[in-house]
Curated annotation (Swiss-Prot):
Belongs to the RimM family. This is Ribosome maturation factor RimM. It is found in: Cytoplasm. An accessory protein needed during the final step in the assembly of 30S ribosomal subunit, possibly for assembly of the head region. Essential for efficient processing of 16S rRNA. May be needed both before and after RbfA during the maturation of 16S rRNA. It has affinity for free ribosomal 30S subunits but not for 70S ribosomes. It comes from Serratia proteamaculans (strain 568). PANTHER family: RIBOSOME MATURATION FACTOR RIMM (PTHR33692:SF1). Keywords: Chaperone, Cytoplasm, Ribosome biogenesis, rRNA processing.
Amino acid sequence: MSKQLKPVAPKQPIVLGKMGSTYGIRGWLRVFSSTENAESIFDYQPWLIQRSGQWQFVELEDWKRHSQDLIIKVKGIDDRDAANLLTNCEIVVDSEQLPPLEGDDYYWKDLMGCQVVTTSGYELGKVIDMMETGSNDVMVVRANLKDAFGMKERLVPFLHGQVIKKVDLTARVIEADWDPGF
C-alpha cells in the first residue's frame, strides 16, 4: 500500500466496490465492482479504504480479469496474509471524481433522500435505496409514518418519461406517475 501522506476522509465518499477474498499466494485479491461497467472501477484513482477507523490510500500495481472475476494486485501487498487483511474493505473515492452526467441520467447517490411525490401531489415517501433489476432500476421508497394506504415501503420503477415525470435534485423532489396504493 502507498506510504504517502496520511489521507483525510473524502468530503463526499462514495463506495465503488469491495475487496473480496484472496487469490493465490502472491497477494492478489478479488474485487467486486459496483460500477455499471465492472472494469470502470479502475478509472477512479486513488482508491481509499478505511481500516481501524483510519483512511488509507490503495495504489494498484496491476489488475486483470480472471474467469468471471476481477482480481487486483495492491502495491506493497506481496503475500496471502497481507492481502487477507484487506478482505471486505470497501473501495471508496470522493464523489467529485465522478464524471458529470447528461440528460436524464442520475447517480443513485443523488437520488437518495429525495421525496417522491405523485403527479396528483400525494407524498409517497423518501428514496432509501435503489435496486438494479436487469430491465430497469427501481427506487425503494420508505413511506411516511401516516401513510393513508398503510404502506411501509414502495418499489417504484425508475423509468424516466413513463413513471418518472420530473427530477429536481435542487429541491430534492422526484415526481412520479404512480398509484399510491400500489
